[in-house]
């Protein structure tokens, strides 16, 4: 079976996945504490809140949560298009966009209760984050939520007994740990800095963006920062949108 991982090399893909998952957990905890228990990346929780608000006739609250879910979906939509368009610059472009959006929220007006404008840039950034990396099957790695990681870990354990798990099984538990650790860090940062704690997540995204920009310039087409894969979650017969430089030696 064709390996559709992005980046192709686990040397960079796994650390990036863990750091980005930690970033998402951190941002989610900051937003949850700062914005009246509104999730920045955990759309399952927001969906439950939406249902409860509708059931109780709290239309401002229902609109508030629904708008956040829509913006997160827009982020995933835009991130996938950027991933397809940017080619070998996919990682730098997506990470710089995320860093910029995480900063932008701090300068946005609060907006009315149903439409929290200052939340949208953060949610948009985290939606885009899910288009950044792909597993061996071409699926976007679940970087901003744990339900998928927990389910894939559980089914992977079963498949470990039945036959063998998918290649992406081994990263699921570390992803959960990274997201949980990031949430702890986010809670501590919010305690001391309030909403300004988002600057920490922006700085982490910018640091990762700078690192992959340097790698892209120094090693164009390297498996460290590229891959031969369709856009995230594309059908099996979709054409590749990124190109890896072929090497006669061991993959870099």
What are these regions (language model features)?
Residues 1-13, 223:
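Short, Lys/Arg-rich, polar N-terminal cytosolic tail immediately upstream
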Residues 99-114, 213-216:
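C-terminal ends and interior cores of transmembrane alpha-helices
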Residues 75-88, 190-191:
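Helix-to-loop junctions at the C-terminal end of transmembrane segments
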Residues 89-94, 187-203:
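A membrane-interface helix-boundary motif in multi-pass transporters
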Residues 96-101, 196-212:
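Symmetry-related core transmembrane helices of the 12-TM Major Facilitator Superfamily/SLC fold
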Residues 18-28, 37-39, 101, 113-144:
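Hydrophobic core of transmembrane alpha-helices in multi-pass small-molecule transporters
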Residues 69, 73-77, 176-184:
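Hydrophobic/small/kink-forming positions within alpha-helical transmembrane segments
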């Amino acid at each position: 079976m064709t390996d559709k991982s992005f980046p192709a090399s686990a040397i960079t893909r796994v650390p990036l996945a863990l750091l980005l998952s930690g970033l998402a957990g951190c941002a989610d905890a900051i937003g949850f504490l700062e914005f009246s228990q509104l999730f920045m990346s955990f759309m399952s929780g927001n969906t439950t809140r939406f249902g409860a608000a509708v059931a109780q006739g709290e239309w401002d609250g229902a609109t508030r949560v629904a708008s956040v879910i829509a913006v997160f979906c827009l982020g995933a939509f835009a991130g996938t298009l950027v991933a397809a368009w940017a080619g070998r610059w996919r990682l730098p472009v997506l990470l710089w966009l995320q860093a910029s959006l995480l900063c932008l929220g701090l300068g946005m007006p609060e907006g009315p209760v149903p439409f929290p404008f200052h939340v949208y840039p953060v949610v948009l950034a985290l939606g885009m984050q899910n288009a950044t990396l792909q597993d061996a099957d071409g699926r976007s790695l679940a970087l901003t939520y744990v339900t998928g990681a927990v389910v894939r870990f559980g089914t992977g354990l079963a498949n470990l007994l039945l036959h063998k798990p998918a290649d992406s099984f081994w990263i699921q538990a570390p992803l959960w740990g990274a997201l949980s650790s990031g949430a702890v860090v986010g809670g501590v940062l919010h305690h001391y800095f309030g909403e300004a704690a988002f600057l920490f997540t922006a700085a982490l995204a910018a640091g990762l963006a700078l690192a992959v920009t340097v790698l892209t310039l120094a090693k164009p087409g390297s498996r460290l920062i590229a891959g031969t894969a369709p856009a995230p979650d594309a059908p099996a017969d979709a054409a590749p949108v990124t190109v890896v430089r072929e090497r006669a030696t061991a993959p870099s």
